[in-house]
Amino acid sequence: MKAESRHERIISAVTCAIALLSLAVFAGCRVNRAGNEHQKDQILYTVIGSDPRTFNPILVTDASSGQLTGDLFETLLQLNPVTTLPEPRLAEKWEIAPDNKTITLHLRRDVKWFDGQPFTAHDVLFTLDVIYDPKVPNSSRPVLLVDKKRIEAEAPDDYTVVLHLPKPFAPLIAALEGFQVIPAHILEPVWKAGDFNHAWGINTPPDQLIGSGIYKMARYSQSQVVNYVRNDSFWMKDEHGGQLPRLHGQNVTIVPDANAEYLRYLSGQIDVYGPRPEEVYPLQQKKDNHELDIQIEKIGVDTGTLFFSFNRNPRRYVKGGITDPKINWFTDLKFLQAMAHMVDKKSMIDLVFHGLAEPAVADISPENKIFANPNLKDYEYDPKLAADMLEAAGYHLVKPDVRTDPKGNRLEFDLTTNTGNPDRNEMCTIFKQDLERLGIKVNYRPLEFTTLVDKLDSSFDWDCILMGFTGGVEPNDGANFYRSSGNLHIWNPNQPTPATPWEAEIDTLLDQGASEMDITKRPPYYWKIQQILHDQLPIIETVRGQRYASWKNSLENYRPKVWGLYKSEWMEFKAD
C-alpha cells in the first residue's frame, strides 16, 4: 500500500460557472490545436496532484513519487489487469520447485540501462540487499520477509537468479510484480558508502536517473511539470518488430487542484482523466452532444481504501514524562466505536460522490473477489447511540457544546487531510460538523500533501487524519500497513514489538496466510485480519467510490481496467 494523493473541492457555483463559460468561448480552437499537437508529437499529456518526494524507487512511500518513477524502472514480473495473473517482464520465465521453497528466475538478455550498460542478475541481487538493509527505510521489506527472514538469492550466471525461501511463501510472485530493479553499477558504491538514503532525491539531474523502463525523465520543474522521452533502447517490440512504447513521450503537469485539472481536460490540455463523481454526468452529456470527442467508461469500484485514523503513537503524546490525554481517548475502544457511528456515509455518498459510491466496511475492496471479507457488519451512522456510548464511557457533555473526558479534559483534537482534494475536504467537513454537535471541538487543518506525509513518516505530529491507500490483488502487498513493524502502519508505525495483542495477532495471521500455498485456504487468514481491524478500529472506513475513466478518442489502445492499464506500451495517437 502506498499513500494516495488527489485533489480538493469548494469552488463557488458562480466561480465555476464563469470558468466554464469562459472555456466555452474559446474551447473550439484550443481543443483542436492541443489535440493536433499531441497527435503530431505522439506525446501523452496528463496531470498529477502533487510533487514527488523522491526519485529513488526503493524509498517511495507516496503515490506521486511512485507514479513519477514507475515508468523509469522495470519490474521482474507484472500483473495482467484483465486476468490478474502474473506475466513476464525482466524475468522472461520462472520455475517453482516442488517444495515451493526455491524459485528460479530466467532474466531477459536484451535489456540495457539508460547508459547502455547491460542489465544482469547482479542488479537483482543488489536490489534485494538494499531492500533488506535495515538502514534503508522502504515499503518493500515487510512484503519480502518470510518468517521474519530475508529471501536468500544467488546468481549461477548473469541471467539466472535463484531465490531460496525459508518456507513456502505464497505472495512471492505478486511481490515480484512490484519489484523494481535498480542499477548496481550506479548505486552500489553509494549504498556501500552509507549514502543510499540521499541518492536520487528530487534535485537529482534527470539524466542521472538511470533506469531500464519505457521512458527516461527529461526534465523536472518543481510544482510545474515532469517531461519524459521514450527509451528507444527499450526491450519490448510489437508484433511487427516495431519499437515500443509507441508514444514518444509524456508531459505530466503538477496540478494540486482538482477543479483546475478538470478544466484542463475540458480545454483539451490533457488527454486522459479520472473524473470525480460530480463530473461523470456532465462529461457524458458533452460526449453525447458531440461537444467533446471523448470516451467515458465505468471501470469498477475503487480498489483502495479511504479511512479516518486516530494517532496512537506514544512518540506523539508522551514527551518529557508528560502524557497528552488524547492518547487515552484514541486507544479507548468505546471512544473509537462512538467515532465510527459518527461517520455519515450516506451523506458522503449523496453529497460528495453524487450517489456514485458505496459504504466501505473493510480495507480490502469488494473488487478483490477472493480476499474481501463479505461478512462484516457496518457501523451505522447513529449520533444518539454515539452520544450514549460516550456518556457511558465517562465522556460527559458538561455544556451544550463542550464534552470532557473522565478526567475533565475537554475533547478537542486536530483533523487533517491533504489539500487540493475537494472530496476529502467535504468529507472532513461533514465529520467535523457532526462531532461538534456532540460537543467535541475539531480543528480542521488540511495540509499540503508532502507536508502531510512528512508528519506521517517523521514527526508523527497529527491527531486524526482522513487518508487513502491504494489496494492490490495480493493482500500481503499491504504488509507494510498491516504489520506492527511496518512503516505505513500509520496509527503507530515501526514498532519494535507489537504494542497490543491484536496487532500481534495480525502479525501472526500475515505469516500464516503467506505460508499457505493453497489459494482456497488463504482467504480466512485475511478475513480475520479485516475482522480485527473492523473491531479494534485503528482505521474507520468511510466510502468506496465508483471509478470512471475518460480519454480523447484520438488516443488509441488506451485500455483502463480497475487493476491498472492494459498493455499501455501500445498506446498511440491516431494519425491526422
Q: Which residue stretches match the model-derived regions?
A:
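Active-site-proximal polar cores
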Residues: 542
